[in-house]
Amino acid sequence: MKKGLIMANHRIDRVGMEIKREVNEILRLRVNDPRVQDVTITDVQMLGDLSMAKVFYTIHSTLASDNQKAQIGLEKATGTIKRELGKNLTMYKIPDLQFVKDESIEYGNKIDEMLRNLDKKD
């Protein structure tokens, strides 16, 4: 039983990594929307039944308006992305995609800045 669970989790991780790679490629080559030009997919988390993928992204801008535009652009491009995934992946059903801004990079940068400021005070 335990081995089957490990194998299932490994497959979920593999599918997530493949979707991450493919979505990055699709955004770069197939989606012509300027709102998603600077978007990079950082992680994909799959539901256990592979019916949904939570796609985490970052954008190379700190402006709130750019972040909002990127989210809207990704939501508009979801149909194109799913269609391209269907062509490139050998899956029975392509999962639904939910795009979520990855806050971890900004959080890490904020911590780095705080640490640098501490060093300057000493």
UniProtKB/Swiss-Prot annotation:
The keyword Iron is assigned to this record: no
Record localization: Cytoplasm
Highest taxon, organism lineage: Bacteria
InterPro entries: KH_dom-like_a/b (IPR015946), RbfA (IPR000238), RbfA_dom_sf (IPR023799), Ribosome-bd_factorA_CS (IPR020053)
GO cellular component: cytosol
Alphabetized UniProt keyword annotations: Cytoplasm, Ribosome biogenesis
GO terms, molecular function: ribosomal small subunit binding
Xref: Pfam families: RBFA
Presence of the UniProt keyword Cytoplasm in the record: yes
Protein task: One of several proteins that assist in the late maturation steps of the functional core of the 30S ribosomal subunit. Associates with free 30S ribosomal subunits (but not with 30S subunits that are part of 70S ribosomes or polysomes). Required for efficient processing of 16S rRNA. May interact with the 5'-terminal helix region of 16S rRNA.
Family listed: Belongs to the RbfA family.
Record-linked NCBIfam families: rbfA (TIGR00082)
Subunit organization: Monomer. Binds 30S ribosomal subunits, but not 50S ribosomal subunits or 70S ribosomes.
Name of this chain's protein: Ribosome-binding factor A
Gene: rbfA
